[in-house]
Design a protein with these regions (language model features):
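P-loop/Walker A NTP-binding region and its immediately flanking N-terminal helices
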Residues: 1-206
Length: 206
């Protein structure tokens, strides 16, 4: 018998499309967990941190920017994300040169923003103190901090879990923290504020 009157077979492609499998040539988007997909990228995205944002804004507007900040809170509240936003604000520049200094107002992606938020900017260096606790790790920072930033306004060091640094390591860090070069800023993150710094340095804490 002829198949001319039979309805077309929709099992190929259509069924797969309905299952969300897509066509073989269609590129699949990489999966990201919600915490990364909706990670804040500016101060406007931060919820419940008005006091901190106001303090940072006042520091920028008056030109009284401290050499270091320390962010504290339980795990998962966004300390490292906030540190990256702060690094972005310190180095926010537009291609036309209209932004002359640090600002909390970042409506568009600046020259350095994408690289900073993706942790791949050469002038924004991140170190996990939980796995880099020794004096040699701190000495690497002490040696590199003297060099000017390659392209950004400031060289920013983000040190996570700073309370995990050994006493000897923090003592080796002390001179650099007290008298850093003008082009260097430090942002520390910790879940244990009492153990951070071993009581040797006073830093603005949020």
């Amino acid at each position: 018998m002829s198949d001319a009157g039979a309805p077309p077979d929709k099992s190929d492609g259509a069924g797969q499309s309905g299952l969300g499998l897509g066509s073989p040539g269609e590129a699949a988007k990489p999966y990201r967990v919600l915490a990364r997909k909706y990670r804040p990228s500016s101060f406007d995205d931060l919820i419940g941190q008005e006091a901190m944002v106001r303090t940072v804004s006042n520091a920028f507007e008056t030109g009284r920017i401290p050499q270091a900040w320390i962010l504290t809170g339980v795990r998962g509240v966004g300390k490292t994300t906030t540190a990256r936003i702060l690094a972005r604000a310190l180095n926010y520049e537009k291609p036309d040169g209209s932004v002359k200094g640090p600002t909390i107002h970042m409506p568009d992606l600046g020259v350095h923003c994408q690289a900073i938020m993706e942790s791949r900017h050469m002038d924004v260096l991140e170190m996990d103190a939980a796995s880099h606790t020794g004096v040699d790790d701190v000495r690497q920072i002490n040696d590199s901090v003297r060099y000017a930033p390659a392209s950004a306004r400031y060289k920013v060091y983000i040190i996570d879990e700073v309370h995990m640094l050994s006493t000897a390591a923090f003592n080796a860090f002390l001179k650099t923290l007290e008298e850093p070069p003008e082009h260097a800023k430090f942002v520390f993150a910790t879940t244990e504020i009492q153990g951070a710094g071993h009581g040797t340095v006073a830093l603005p804490a949020f």
